[in-house]
Design a protein with these regions (language model features):
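Juxtamembrane/interfacial segments at transmembrane-helix boundaries in multi-pass membrane proteins
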Residues: 56-84, 187-244, 267-288, 325, ...
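Hydrophobic alpha-helical transmembrane segments of multi-pass membrane proteins
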Residues: 96-99, 180, 223-230, 256-257, ...
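Transmembrane helix-loop-helix hairpins at membrane boundaries of multipass inner-membrane proteins
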Residues: 1-11, 21-126, 501-510, 518
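Alpha-helical transmembrane segments and their helix-start/interface "positive-inside/aromatic belt" motifs
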Residues: 31-42, 173-183, 311, 315, ...
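Predominantly late transmembrane helices and immediately cytosolic-facing juxtamembrane segments
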Residues: 236, 364-368, 432-467
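Alpha-helical multi-pass transmembrane bundles of energy-transducing inner-membrane proteins
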Residues: 29, 123-130, 134-220, 231, ...
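Membrane-interface alpha-helices at helix entry/exit sites of multi-pass transporters
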Residues: 34-36, 174-177, 249-259, 381-397, ...
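Structural signature of hydrophobic alpha-helical transmembrane segments
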Residues: 4-15, 91-102, 144-157, 216-231, ...
Length: 522
């Protein structure tokens, strides 16, 4: 068991990669065997993630050096800097790993029925596993270049999955937009990395943080990295791709795309807090991120009001919810150099942002799965063409209502638990920001109430009289999200104490992250 945990960082990435190449071979022999192997494999990965999380929370940062005589040996004998590929897993990394593991497993369970009638399922599961491996790599890697590599893996596989249903023109358009935006963001990341590498001859994040001199080129690199990852997570004004992509991808893939966007949010946090940290005055950077967050909240919710396509409505709500996370992150960055303010409300704002990341994945994921279930049964996403579905799709209707209430931040659901942390902390920083957040949540509730009544209430339309509930595996996938939403809403204190606070502490502790690399010399 000890050896398994020691090697778990690389296994968590390697197992999905291996399964991605084995899936087509197994699928040619038996579809059932292929499905079973994928589910068992991702269940094993989830087990490794939770085991690693326990180890990190109890024992601190876990480093894994590929090719070293010992996985914990980060700096080879005879050198003063890390030169190998290093995976560095701390509280915030493993937190994101938990999010990815849960969502990936749910996505596969949902796909068993939702993608059953599609051709090319071997390719579908291969691409899905590649995207999962890339997402894990983004949050576990300890160097910037491999962050770029894993970002590329998620981008290419994600674009192919968005456009997977090639018979639909809008799917192809969505996939094309996703790959174009991803390519631009990736090139920006690569250019920023080249600016840093040219100065310091280093790629490891911890080593770079220790050597950082905050030159003009360093500041330019920071601006480029913020813009690139804000684009990937769908922050305004770089959100133009998100609704066109999320609304046309298979529902299970949209859920995974949310985690990829959150991996970009993680990268933004890692760069701001660890790579640059307190030495650089982050007040201006924090306010820029707050501004992006407020714009995302406002534009996201106002665009959602206008939508009649249920998936586009949820997609714009994703833009809005990303705004809440960005505001919490921005407040934390703004007071990073002020120990008193950081302790009073800064860490609470960061905790709210981090907690909202997993909550966002859960309730938005549930809403997209519900939208996928509706499309699976009636073949349309147009709310004006729906009505009375709650009579024949009772579970689906209940799941939509649950996700909508959670997204609106109402108790006793998980969205309330994370938003209240953001509201309370941000109020101490600037009350106006909290008022804006509350107003946005009220409008969000109104949007979802309207959508719920349009789709599920009223008399059953004649053309939908024979509509039945979706298959059991799709119900099971939605149930997993629903149960976690309720648990997180009823026991938020436990979740904050067990995983959110360790993630927050790791994010603001630049010295420990650096020492985990630079202190492990032979």
């Amino acid at each position: 068991m000890v050896t398994l945990i020691e090697h778990s960082p690389v296994l968590i990435i390697a197992v999905p990669l291996l399964l991605a190449f084995l899936t087509p071979l197994i699928g040619m022999a038996s579809k059932k065997a292929r499905n079973a192997v994928v589910i068992v494999g991702l269940s094993f990965v989830a087990f490794l993630v939770f085991a690693l999380a326990r180890d990190v929370i109890l024992n601190g940062i876990h480093t894994y050096t590929l090719g070293a005589t010992s996985p914990s040996l980060t700096i080879p004998e005879g050198t003063m800097v890390p030169i190998r590929i290093i995976l560095e897993v701390d509280g915030v990394s493993v937190f994101m790993g938990i999010v990815i593991a849960i969502v990936a497993l749910v996505a596969v369970i949902y796909s068993l029925s939702s993608m059953k009638g599609e051709t090319g399922q071997n390719r579908f599961y291969t691409l899905l596993l590649l995207m999962v491996a890339g997402a894990f790599g983004m949050v576990f890697t300890g160097d910037l270049f491999n962050l770029f590599v894993f970002l590329e893996i998620t981008s290419i596989s994600g674009a192919a999955l968005v456009a997977f249903k090639t018979r639909f023109a809008d799917s192809q358009e969505g996939g094309f937009k996703y790959i174009v935006v991803s390519a631009v963001a990736s090139l920006m990341v690569l250019f920023a990395i080249s600016l840093l590498y040219a100065q310091y001859n280093l790629l490891n994040i911890g080593a770079l943080a220790a050597a950082m001199q905050y030159t003009m080129l360093d500041r330019i690199a920071l601006v480029i990295l913020i813009a690139a990852f804000a684009m990937k997570l769908g922050g305004v004004p770089m959100h133009m791709w998100l609704s066109d992509t999320y609304s046309v991808a298979p529902a299970s893939i949209t859920v995974l795309l949310i985690t990829v966007s959150q991996a970009s949010m993680y990268a933004l946090m890692r760069i701001c807090f660890i790579l640059y940290g307190v030495t650089l005055d982050m007040a201006v950077v924090g306010w820029i991120i707050i501004a992006i967050g407020i714009l995302s909240m406002f534009i996201g919710v106002t665009m959602a009001v206008r939508q009649t396509d249920i998936t586009r409505l949820i997609a714009y709500n994703c833009v809005c919810e990303a705004g809440f996370m960005l505001v919490g992150l921005g407040v934390g960055l703004t007071v990073l150099g002020n120990p008193t303010a950081l302790k009073t409300y800064g860490t609470m704002a960061i905790s709210g942002s981090i907690f909202h990341m997993i909550n966002h994945a859960l309730f938005e994921g549930l809403l997209f799965l519900v939208a996928g279930a509706i499309f699976y049964r009636i073949g349309t996403r147009d709310l004006n063409q729906m009505g009375g579905l709650g009579h024949t799709m009772k579970f689906t209707a209940a799941f939509f209502l649950l996700g909508a209430l959670a997204s609106s931040g109402l108790p006793p659901f998980n969205g309330f638990a994370s938003k209240i942390l953001i509201y309370e902390s941000v109020y101490q920083f600037n009350p106006v920001l909290t008022i804006i957040g509350i107003l946005v949540s009220i409008i969000t509730l109104a949007v979802f109430v309207k959508a719920f009544f349009s789709a599920f209430t009223g008399a059953v339309l004649p053309k939908y009289e024979d509509v039945k509930e979706v298959p059991k595996t799709m119900i099971a996938a939605m149930t997993i999200f629903a149960v976690i939403i309720i648990i997180f809403g009823l026991f938020p204190g436990l979740i904050v104490d067990w995983v959110v606070r360790p993630a927050t502490n790791a994010l603001v502790d630049q010295a420990s992250y650096i020492n985990a690399i630079m202190g492990a010399m032979p």
